[in-house]
Regions:
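Oxyanion/phosphate-interacting regions
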Residues: 1-15, 19, 147, 179-184, ...
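Glycine-rich active-site/cofactor-binding loop and its immediate structural neighborhood
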Residues: 80-122
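N-terminal subdomain of lithium-sensitive/metallo-dependent phosphomonoesterases centered on the IMPase/IPPase/PAP
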Residues: 1-89, 110, 144-145, 179-182, ...
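Short, surface-exposed acidic/glycine-rich loop or hinge patches that mediate macromolecular interfaces
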Residues: 46, 171-172, 215
Length: 267
């Protein structure tokens, strides 16, 4: 599916609108509910989901939507060739901590691969998106846009640097991650970052690699996946396979590396 500029603009504004609704709750003592997997859920997650579902359904009424907050059974979605994959509030733990590192994620999946991704960080007022085969972009805004012409093209910037900037999860660190980094690199700095912003940091050349040895779901990474690819980066499983979407009943990803250059994962 080819997404024209006007449709992309509408989708970006849907993410911004949802993000602004999330900000309405940001300074409040929001009630927290814990799901079966012990992950937190707030009214901000639910309201963002309603806005995204409604907006995207109007923009592309014939494309189904799979959301973290409205899971759809495998029997229903297993034959989908095209669908929207959304995370209405990625980084709920960061939202609760009030550190600003949470995002709205929208991705379009076609034939098990992301072809469009939008990431909006409402507390930072920063929007990321790709244009298929023509790069990834960012634009600063806290209100709906009339045009995307003022966006800035971004790209990975790794060039055999001496100090490697390694990104880690702010809420999901583990020993495997620490050991891998120490064994792989001599001179490095680990920066903890929440949500899909880790993909954006690599995509705009602020970091080099994000090794993930803990659980993630497909809606956590799909938007960041295509933004990273279009900026010149890569995302591979730890056994060097491409990641695919909606190929099985569960939506868990394998452990993976998101990175700027192949040299970062070579033995």
């Amino acid at each position: 599916m080819k997404i024209d500029e006007n449709t992309l603009l509408q989708l970006c504004n849907a993410a911004i609108t949802a993000g602004n609704r999330v900000l309405d709750f940001y300074e409040l003592d929001t009630e927290i509910i814990y799901k079966k997997d012990e992950s937190p859920l707030t009214k901000a997650d639910l309201d963002s989901n309603k806005i995204l579902q409604s907006s995207i359904s109007k923009i592309t009424p014939n494309i189904p939507i799979l959301s973290e907050e409205e899971f759809i059974a495998w029997n229903t979605r297993k034959n989908w060739k095209k669908y929207w994959l959304i995370d209405p509030l990625d980084g709920t733990k960061e939202f609760i901590k009030k550190n600003g590192e949470f995002t709205i994620n929208i991705a379009l999946i076609e034939y098990n691969q992301p072809v469009l991704g939008i990431i909006y960080a409402p507390a930072l007022g920063c929007l990321f998106f790709p244009k298929k085969n023509s790069g990834s972009y960012k634009i600063y805004t806290k209100s709906n846009l009339d045009t995307l012409n003022n966006s800035e093209k971004i790209s990975v910037k790794y060039k055999n640097k001496e100090k490697i900037i390694v990104l880690g999860s702010r809420s999901h660190s583990n020993v495997t991650f620490d050991n891998w980094v120490k064994n792989k690199f001599t001179d490095f700095e680990i920066i903890e970052k929440g949500s899909s912003l880790k993909f954006c940091e690599i995509a705009e050349g602020k970091a080099d690699i994000y090794p993930r040895f803990g659980p993630t779901s497909e809606w956590d990474i799909a938007a960041g996946h295509i933004i990273l690819l279009e900026s010149g980066g890569k995302l591979k499983s730890i056994d060097n396979k491409d990641l695919v979407y909606n190929t099985k009943e569960d939506i868990l990803n394998p452990h993976f590396f998101a990175y700027a250059d192949d040299a970062l994962i070579k033995n």
